[in-house]
Design a protein with these regions (language model features):
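Alpha-helical segment proximal to the catalytic Tyr-Lys
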Residues: 127, 171-175
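Active-site loop immediately N-terminal to the catalytic Tyr-X3-Lys motif
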Residues: 100, 147-153, 157, 175-176
Length: 176
């Protein structure tokens, strides 16, 4: 099902993102994983190549907060592979900071990584997917987007925004 599909997976160096990268590779996809730092991307790539040297996997570390850097990296991927079939927005940051210890900067940092970064990846990718006649965008969310959590208010708020983004994109792009 994923044979020869080209996928970008953000937050692909550890946890859910790394497991997603592995599953896509096991099913024949060509994967470009995004991570926050060169060292973590290179470490993940080395581990994946050690497990299966035949897997088609590469990595990049654009600042997901920078829409231009993200767009440039996504365009490079399109130029390399000729298409982008799947975007998995998995990069994110959890939080358990009590509200009385919050700052506006802390709240914005979480919203930026969990919501704005996804949009920064979606915008250039949607254009490519429309040009090629389709694609798939997956956004990682959390149950706390529905039920909240006892502290770290920005995390459930950000994941609620991701849900709204996902539902809106499905309604806008799904019919096409």
């Amino acid at each position: 099902m994923l044979k020869s599909k080209v996928a970008i997976i953000t937050g692909g160096t550890r946890g859910i993102g790394y497991a997603t990268v592995k599953k896509f590779l096991e099913n024949g996809a060509k994967v470009v994983l995004f991570g926050s730092r060169q060292e973590t991307v290179e470490k993940a790539l080395a581990s994946l190549k050690e497990e299966n040297p035949d897997w088609e996997v590469s990595g990049a570390w654009p600042s997901l907060a920078d829409p231009e850097a993200v767009a440039q990296e996504i365009e490079k991927i399109r130029e390399t592979f000729g298409r982008i079939d799947i975007l998995v927005n998995n990069a994110g940051m959890s939080d358990s900071t009590p509200i009385d210890n919050y700052t506006a900067e802390h709240f914005e940092k979480i919203m930026s990584l969990n919501v704005s970064a996804a949009m920064n990846c979606i915008m250039p990718t949607v254009k490519i997917m429309k040009e090629q006649g389709g694609g798939c965008i997956l956004n990682t969310s959390s149950m706390v987007s529905i039920c909240g959590q006892p502290s770290g208010v920005a995390y459930p708020v950000s994941k609620s925004a991701v849900n709204g983004l996902t539902w809106s994109l499905a309604r806008e792009l799904g019919p096409s």
